[in-house]
């Protein structure tokens, strides 16, 4: 980020953070506990953040990564969302990249070279890739601004989203004790938060729990009767011109529903695990841009 180097180091951390928020991300002010979290992590301390989806979790590590020397390493199990985040950051002028199984060898090598040369502000990486000896050895030679562990509830062995690799992320504290860490989740009760803190060695981290009141979100339950007609009416009458996601219970249902909507003049794309990576990436990109 070219503009950050011109900020006077005599400015307070809060002023610098607000400058980045406004000039890079385009928001006039922080919301809720964002400013406090950003201050904490940017000053080199650890945090555990529980915040609803859409509550601004990403800014809590993106801004500290831009304020601190080096590259922020973001651990995420959601490969599809990595591309979204990197594309959105690139449009803002932030030097971001990702490493995951969707890339071919040449793409991964280009990203690794950029990291080694200090050309990245943020690197999104899947936990299984991060935990390889090769990757950890590479990080030993890199200036790391922070570690952000997204979807931190995946460390809980009692949760539906348990990922065994997440338990091994305690190595980040052991191997890089001077690098601040921020663990983030939108799904964790008090017991799960304690488990996250224990397994990731974040017992001393400051915990932030945001309100989950989301007045802009509502559930509507409709009795099933001629499902396709109901879906069509819902889209045309309540969400004409909007973008949306239709969840189905099987891959075949995804394909059938996509075909039906297109036949009705509603542009729709399929997305499921049975599709090749290139097609999923292309459909995801089109959904975000068209």
Regions found by a protein language model. Give the residues of each.
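Helicase motor core with emphasis on the C-terminal RecA-like subdomain
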Residues: 7-11, 15-24, 28-32, 36-48, ...
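Residue-identity detector for glycine
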Residues: 2-5
């Amino acid at each position: 980020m070219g503009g950050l180097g011109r900020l006077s180091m005599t400015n307070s951390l809060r002023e610098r953070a607000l400058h980045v928020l406004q000039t890079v991300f385009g928001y006039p002010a922080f919301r809720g506990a964002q400013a406090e979290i950003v201050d904490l992590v940017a000053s080199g301390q650890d945090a555990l953040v529980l915040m609803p989806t859409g509550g601004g979790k990403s800014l809590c590590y993106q801004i500290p990564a831009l304020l601190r020397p080096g590259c922020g390493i973001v651990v995420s199990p959601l490969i599809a969302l990595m591309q979204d985040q990197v594309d959105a950051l690139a449009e803002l002028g932030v030097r971001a990249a990702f490493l995951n199984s969707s890339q071919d060898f040449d793409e991964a090598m280009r990203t690794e070279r950029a990291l080694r040369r200090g050309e990245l502000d943020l690197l999104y990486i899947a936990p299984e890739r991060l935990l390889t000896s090769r990757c950890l050895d590479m990080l030993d030679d890199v200036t790391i601004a922070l570690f952000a562990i997204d979807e931190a509830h995946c460390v809980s062995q009692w949760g539906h989203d348990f990922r065994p690799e997440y338990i091994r992320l305690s190595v980040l504290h052991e191997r890089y004790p001077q690098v601040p860490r921020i663990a983030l989740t939108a799904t964790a009760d008090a017991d799960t938060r304690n488990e996250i803190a224990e397994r990731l060695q974040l017992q001393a981290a400051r915990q932030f729990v945001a309100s989950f009141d989301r007045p802009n979100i509502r559930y509507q339950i409709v009795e099933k009767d001629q499902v396709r007609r109901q879906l069509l009416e819902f889209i045309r009458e309540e969400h004409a011109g909007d973008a949306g996601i239709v969840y189905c219970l099987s891959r075949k249902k995804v394909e059938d529903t996509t075909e039906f909507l297109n036949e009705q003049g509603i542009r729709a794309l399929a997305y499921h695990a049975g599709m090749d990576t290139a097609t999923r990436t292309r459909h995801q990109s089109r959904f975000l841009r068209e």
